[in-house]
Regions:
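Generic enzyme active-site microenvironment
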Residues: 9-11, 107, 164-165
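Conserved H-loop
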Residues: 68, 125-129
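Substrate-recognition element of Asp-dependent hydrolases with the DxDx(T/V) motif
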Residues: 71-84, 91-122, 132-136
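Conserved Lys-Pro-Asp/Glu-containing loop-to-beta segment of HAD-superfamily phosphomonoesterases
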Residues: 141-173
Length: 182
């Protein structure tokens, strides 16, 4: 009897990289642009402080500096910027090793453009099969629905499935209901 194929499905944010690094990348890009356009230096540190305090960063900087920008413009920029991100060495080695013997998939909630920019910046296309990457906006289902997991199970039948994520309240519910180790 042949051993079953292993399918390892990862979450993206705060599993393969720290999502705060995406936030810092976006804030850096915005701070640089605002400094160049409006002459306001050192805005990154302020933005990070406001974020850590739980304040609405975009509303705060717009009102504090009288910027002729809208929250919607800054939010769009945040979501669509091309981030500067890097996998840490241990994560890269793990993915390299696993990709030699397992099918690697990804299931992530979020906007397609944002998640795809993150994956490209991290170089994840080298490890993950394109048909095994599921983004909630693209498929119309979140990880709280069993549908994305069932889709991968249909694509890779007769396999053993593992799910790796960071949020037990969100990431593990459906995989556990379907009998996958998490």
């Amino acid at each position: 009897m042949m051993p079953k194929r292993k399918v390892v499905i990862f979450d993206l944010d705060d599993t393969l990289f720290k999502e705060v690094d995406y936030l810092k990348s976006a804030y850096q890009e915005m701070a640089d642009d605002i400094e160049a356009r409006f002459g306001i230096p050192h805005l990154l540190d302020e933005m990070l402080t406001y974020w850590q305090e739980g304040r609405n960063v975009f509303n705060t900087i717009i009102s504090q500096y009288g910027l002729p920008l809208t929250v919607e413009e800054l939010l769009k920029r945040y979501r669509e910027h091309v981030p500067t991100l890097q996998l840490d060495a241990d994560t890269s080695r793990m993915l390299e090793k696993l990709s030699q013997t397992c099918v690697l998939g990804m299931m992530t909630d979020g906007r397609s453009v944002t998640q795809r920019h993150k994956m490209a910046a991290l170089g994840l296309e080298a490890f993950f099969r394109p048909d095994a990457i599921l983004i909630s906006e693209e498929i119309g289902q979140t990880k709280l629905s069993p549908e994305p997991f069932l889709r991968l199970m249909d694509q890779y039948p007769d396999s053993v499935y593992y799910y790796i994520g960071d949020n037990p309240q969100k990431d593990f519910i459906c995989p556990n209901q379907l009998g996958s180790p998490t």
